[in-house]
């Protein structure tokens, strides 16, 4: 049976709860949801959806890189928006990173941690 391997990098925000930044299992990396915390400051700095989405993508990129993967190997993403009115602006940022158009779900939720506007998680191959 394949082992679970935890992924951790200081180039993305530390988990704010009892979970790992990502887990590798059987040749696949499963990231936890990333929110737009700047890992250098520990703060959410951007106030608009585009800025927050960019920070989320930077964080995800670092987690994927540490795991030995990247955006081009994404199989599935799950995206959470605080307001579906931000859908188009979010997609503009998302499309710059996920150029292979992986499977995706995108939903609006009532509240996200730290009252951010966006959170994204990824399943990717190694």
Predicted regions and their residues:
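Short, polar/acidic, helix-capping and beta-turn segments at strand->helix junctions
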Residues: 2-126
């Amino acid at each position: 049976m394949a082992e679970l391997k935890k992924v951790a990098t200081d180039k993305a925000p530390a988990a704010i709860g009892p979970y790992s930044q990502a887990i590798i299992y059987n040749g696949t990396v499963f990231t936890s949801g990333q929110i737009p915390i700047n890992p250098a400051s520990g703060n959410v700095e951007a106030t608009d959806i585009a800025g927050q989405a960019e920070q989320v993508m930077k964080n995800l990129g670092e987690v994927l890189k540490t795991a030995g993967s990247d955006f081009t190997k994404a199989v599935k993403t799950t995206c959470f928006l605080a307001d579906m009115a931000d859908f188009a602006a979010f997609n503009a940022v998302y499309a710059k990173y996920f150029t292979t158009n992986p499977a995706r779900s995108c939903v609006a939720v009532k509240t996200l941690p730290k009252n951010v506007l966006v959170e994204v998680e990824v399943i990717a191959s190694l």
